[in-house]
Amino acid sequence: MRKKTICIIFGGISVEHEVSIISANSILNNIDLKKYRPVGLYLTKKGIFKNCKIITKSGKKQFSPQGYLISFKPGAKKPIEINKNMSIEVDVFFPIIHGTGGEDGSIQGLIKILDRPFIGCDMLGSAITMNKILTKELVKKEGINITKYEIIENSLSDKKIKMIKKNIGFPCFVKAANLGSSIGVYKANNEKELKLNIKKSLNFTNNVFVEEAVINAAEIEVSALQV
């Protein structure tokens, strides 16, 4: 039986670059090699694509970035061209870039142009859910309970602090609205921590929100294996 080639795209321009590398290597070490042939496509922090070879280090496989990618070939069975004599055949793309440029619909759009299937949400779903505030509002309109929150744009004012203390209270969480799930996220137990953490979060993005803490909550992760 012919093995399907899975192209794992990792790295990226976001601050979660290193986490993406860990994720890609984890997939590499857990994928069923009897069914699939994994290949790596690495995106540098400067936005340059590189092909990869697979090496073994300390008993674990890992992707090792090599030369620069020359071009993409939309619609081709071998959509990744390394040089005139070398192209990579891809059955399915597996984008594992975290945060900006990876989970916001950008890389999904590129794969759409290449006309190849990929794992994960489509462009629209990715773009919407990357914005936590927009996602909360859409969920709310569907009648699903959400935590109370206050939005902060660009800068912090004393008036906004008073609103947060009145409507949200402590403890609370400060979150960057449009970054990866753990970037620019801080817990505040008092007004001093609140002001400090809002300023820290605003270093990452102009859109920040403060959300009430949910006591004794359970976090549930759901994997969609097939749709």
Residue ranges, per PLM feature:
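Short, glycine-/small-residue-rich phosphate/pyrophosphate-handling segment
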Residues: 130-150
